[in-house]
């Protein structure tokens, strides 16, 4: 069964933080990448033009850095860009530095992705979500991670059906 890669030397996050890889996107039932869909939804929430341009630049840089294996993995969940999601088996979380103002609240942004163990160098984007700070944000984040895990499982099933 496909699972999150746990590299013998580098552990979790080996591709995004050490070896590099290439991106594919998990897609919805209409074939639209979740990453594209969620970026569009975020744009529709009246994010300011300046924040939008900064977000695009940061996401593009994050994706390039992961492809090159230049992100920082942190299993303490406090300092690095990438960590393993605690509540899911197959999901990694990349924290964006930028926060955006939505409806008068600063929101933290997270890219959820996986590094499937059975496809060499693959970085699979699962979701780009935003959350509040504090405990309510942690509850939102748990929901986002659970959704990303379901998307990973769906991606695995779709591959098997082909």
Language-model regions, residue ranges each:
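Short low-polarity hydrophobic stretches
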Residues: 112-113, 148
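Active-site beta-strand-loop-beta-strand hairpin of nuclease catalytic cores
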Residues: 109, 116-126
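Basic, Lys/Arg-enriched alpha-helical interface segments
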Residues: 1-107, 119, 130-162
């Amino acid at each position: 069964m496909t699972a999150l890669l746990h590299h013998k030397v580098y552990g979790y996050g080996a591709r995004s933080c050490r070896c590099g890889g290439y991106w594919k996107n998990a897609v919805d039932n209409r074939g639209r990448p979740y990453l594209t869909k969620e970026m569009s939804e975020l744009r529709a929430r009246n994010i300011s033009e300046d924040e939008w341009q900064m977000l695009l630049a940061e996401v593009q840089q994050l994706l390039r850095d992961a492809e090159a294996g230049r992100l920082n993995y942190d299993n303490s969940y406090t300092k690095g860009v990438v960590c393993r999601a605690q509540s899911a088996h197959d999901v990694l979380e990349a924290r964006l530095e930028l926060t955006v103002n939505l409806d008068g609240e600063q929101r933290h942004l997270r890219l959820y992705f996986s590094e499937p163990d059975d496809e060499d160098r693959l970085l699979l984007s699962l979701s780009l979500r935003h959350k509040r700070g504090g405990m309510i944000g942690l509850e939102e984040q748990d929901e986002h991670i659970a959704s990303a895990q379901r998307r990973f499982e769906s991606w695995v099933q779709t591959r098997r059906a082909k």
